[in-house]
């Protein structure tokens, strides 16, 4: 039997689930335990196909709009946050609802409301159509928030009063891209009000930094995450910028060994909504084909946890 070729695998750390994702999944699981199935979930609880399929098997029913859920069953709002109109509609229907919005997304909602109450014109840096952006813009009256996606958008933005502008951001953006947009806004509007603490969340930042640390040494980077996961897509982009050929895959089945022909070092990471079992699946598949030397590249320690809603605590 021919010997397997050697392959160094650099495993990014931190990777995978963040505290907000962990909390959101627990909310659905505990709601099913407490209230029985079905429990309805408005939008995918987190953007990962494997997580969604597992929760479906437990008794979760995923819908895109609240009117697709019956009045007499619990409904959970996804980790990405929802416009104010959604809980208002649930209350008017006397529905039992549980809000799994990540507390760090809720922080952005509070900031946006504070700026609005202070009479500032608000800029949201984010990706059009992403549920988090829809939810943040939906905290305020229509037209109160201007969405900016690029430096070009920042240069074209024309506020009513250049001295009275504030910005907030989506939590799952590219740290580097966002810094460029913020720099452009600050250059144009020196008095622009900024978040007290950066809106891009600790987990997004840490995972991007971990990718930078391994992608500079790896020829190929494999990112585990679904294509609709903003933070996972950003990890692949960060890897490419750092010089690696980066591929975003759902699971080990998506691994193409032609990517690894002539490759000595591969980096592996997972987006904040991707379970660790998917990483292990890739490592197992690599070990079938290669003599793997595994190195964990630890760039940060995460100790953040978030409390469950009172209705499910204990």
Curated annotation (Swiss-Prot):
List, alphabetically, the InterPro entries matched.
LytB/IspH
Q: Show the active-site residues.
A: 132
Q: Which residues form a coiled coil?
A: none
Entry EC no(s): 1.17.7.4
Please give the cofactor(s) recorded in the UniProt entry for this protein. Answer: [4Fe-4S] cluster
Q: Report the Pfam families cross-referenced here.
A: LYTB (PF02401)
| Cofactor, free-text remark | Binds 1 [4Fe-4S] cluster per subunit.
The reply to whether Oxidoreductase figures as a keyword in the UniProt entry is yes
Q: Which GO terms describe its molecular function?
A: 4 iron, 4 sulfur cluster binding; 4-hydroxy-3-methylbut-2-enyl diphosphate reductase activity; metal ion binding
Q: What is this protein called?
A: 4-hydroxy-3-methylbut-2-enyl diphosphate reductase
HAMAP family on file: IspH
Which keywords are on file for this protein? 4Fe-4S, Iron, Iron-sulfur, Isoprene biosynthesis, Metal-binding, Oxidoreductase
Annotated binding of dimethylallyl diphosphate, by residue: 47, 80, 130, 229-231, 273
Known pathway:
Isoprenoid biosynthesis; dimethylallyl diphosphate biosynthesis; dimethylallyl diphosphate from (2E)-4-hydroxy-3-methylbutenyl diphosphate: step 1/1; Isoprenoid biosynthesis; isopentenyl diphosphate biosynthesis via DXP pathway; isopentenyl diphosphate from 1-deoxy-D-xylulose 5-phosphate: step 6/6
**Binding residues annotated for [4Fe-4S] cluster, in chain numbering:** 18, 102, 201
Catalytic activity, as annotated: isopentenyl diphosphate + 2 oxidized [2Fe-2S]-[ferredoxin] + H2O = (2E)-4-hydroxy-3-methylbut-2-enyl diphosphate + 2 reduced [2Fe-2S]-[ferredoxin] + 2 H(+); dimethylallyl diphosphate + 2 oxidized [2Fe-2S]-[ferredoxin] + H2O = (2E)-4-hydroxy-3-methylbut-2-enyl diphosphate + 2 reduced [2Fe-2S]-[ferredoxin] + 2 H(+)
Q: Which NCBIfam families match?
A: ispH_lytB (TIGR00216), PRK01045.1-2 (NF002188), PRK01045.1-4 (NF002190)
What's a BP term from Gene Ontology annotated to this protein?
Answer: terpenoid biosynthetic process
Summary of the function given for this chain in its UniProt record? Catalyzes the conversion of 1-hydroxy-2-methyl-2-(E)-butenyl 4-diphosphate (HMBPP) into a mixture of isopentenyl diphosphate (IPP) and dimethylallyl diphosphate (DMAPP). Acts in the terminal step of the DOXP/MEP pathway for isoprenoid precursor biosynthesis.
Q: Which residues bind (2E)-4-hydroxy-3-methylbut-2-enyl diphosphate?
A: 47, 80, 130, 171, 229-231, 273
Write out the residues that bind isopentenyl diphosphate. 47, 80, 130, 229-231, 273
Give the family this protein belongs to, as stated in its UniProt record: Belongs to the IspH family.
